[in-house]
């Protein structure tokens, strides 16, 4: 690891409670909340795009962000797009040190192509707290047994 890499790794991020937004072009738009108590900030498409039926696409927002310290940004579906058009999001974690363009992966679960116009709300950005825990390797004996044990994937009930 070079000294430049080490200094970047040790870089201290500015302490803030603001979501900072850089508009990368005139097509970028500052995220907005649909209501005062909305959990997420609406993200806007910076381009016209088509998400094919049963397909996926990567949609540009032309923004970069800095999330508040102790959080990350999660790109989540908009409920109206999910219910009315079968549109969901994927691969949506934006780390606190990411400075590239925010892009949105959209999946179309419907039978019809989904048309996006420049300026359409396509997803929402939810800020979530994160715990950066130390990692400690343990022995099998230290792995406490629980009532559930190794049961997974529906093991706790049928419904």
UniProtKB/Swiss-Prot annotation:
Q: Which family does it belong to?
A: Belongs to the dUTPase family.
Q: How does it assemble?
A: Homotrimer.
The protein's enzyme class: hydrolase
Cofactor needs: Mg(2+)
Known Gene3D superfamilies for this protein?
Answer: 2.70.40.10
Assigned keywords, A-Z: Hydrolase, Magnesium, Metal-binding, Nucleotide metabolism
Task: State where dUMP binds.
Answer: 79, 92, 95, 98, 103, 148, 153-154
Molecular function GO labels = dITP diphosphatase activity; dUTP diphosphatase activity; magnesium ion binding
Provide an example Pfam family for this protein: dUTPase
**What EC number(s) does the entry state?**
3.6.1.23
Name this polypeptide is given: Deoxyuridine 5'-triphosphate nucleotidohydrolase
Q: Which pathway does this polypeptide act in?
A: Pyrimidine metabolism; dUMP biosynthesis; dUMP from dCTP (dUTP route): step 2/2
The GO biological-process annotations, alphabetized, read as: dITP catabolic process; dUMP biosynthetic process; dUTP catabolic process
Q: Which reaction does it catalyse?
A: dUTP + H2O = dUMP + diphosphate + H(+)
The job of this chain, per UniProt, is described as: Involved in nucleotide metabolism via production of dUMP, the immediate precursor of thymidine nucleotides, and decreases the intracellular concentration of dUTP so that uracil cannot be incorporated into DNA.
Q: Note the superkingdom of the native organism.
A: Eukaryota
